[in-house]
């Protein structure tokens, strides 16, 4: 079920083909958007893209884990993780249906 992996170059080419910017301008646009998303996430902000989904940074507290091979308990330090929550529109599109756009 694995499909093609879309790269920055693929996104740049899609912008070039659909928007009509030069390849250089398309690459700059893609880099700017991705950079802004990264900057927002690094500062702890949620990035919400309507009809696509939300990127959310969550704090995970300190906890005790276990080495599966030895069974020895290991302390896992607190950390920040990023999660993606797809919108209902994206979920429906992936599953072949059409959903009404929402603000997720």
From Swiss-Prot:
Q: Which GO terms describe its cellular component?
A: cytosol
Q: Which InterPro entries match?
A: Hist_DNA-bd, Histone-like_DNA-bd_CS, IHF-like_DNA-bd_dom_sf, IHF_alpha
Cited Pfam families: Bac_DNA_binding
* UniProt record, GO biological process: DNA recombination; positive regulation of metabolic process; regulation of DNA-templated transcription; regulation of translation
The record's SUPFAM superfamilies line, in alphabetical order, gives:
IHF-like DNA-binding proteins
Alphabetical keyword list: DNA recombination, DNA-binding, Transcription, Transcription regulation, Translation regulation
What Gene3D superfamilies does this protein map onto? IHF-like DNA-binding proteins
Molecular function (GO) terms for this protein are: DNA binding; structural constituent of chromatin
Q: Which domain of life is it from?
A: Bacteria
Entries under PROSITE patterns matching the protein: HISTONE_LIKE (PS00045)
Subunit: Heterodimer of an alpha and a beta chain.
By sequence similarity, the record places it as follows: Belongs to the bacterial histone-like protein family.
Function, as annotated: This protein is one of the two subunits of integration host factor, a specific DNA-binding protein that functions in genetic recombination as well as in transcriptional and translational control.
Please give the name of this protein.
Integration host factor subunit alpha
Q: Which organism is it from?
A: Methylobacterium sp. (strain 4-46)
Q: What is the lineage of its organism?
A: Bacteria, Pseudomonadati, Pseudomonadota, Alphaproteobacteria, Hyphomicrobiales
């Amino acid at each position: 079920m694995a499909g093609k992996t879309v790269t920055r170059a693929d996104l740049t080419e899609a912008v070039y083909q659909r928007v009509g910017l030069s390849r250089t301008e398309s690459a700059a646009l893609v880099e700017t958007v991705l950079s802004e998303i990264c900057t927002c996430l690094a500062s702890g902000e949620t990035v919400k893209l309507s009809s696509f989904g939300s990127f959310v940074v969550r704090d995970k507290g300190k906890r005790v884990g276990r080495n599966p091979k030895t069974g020895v308990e290991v302390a896992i330090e607190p950390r920040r993780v990023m999660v993606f929550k797809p919108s209902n529109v994206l979920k429906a599109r992936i599953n072949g249906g059409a959903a009404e756009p929402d603000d997720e």
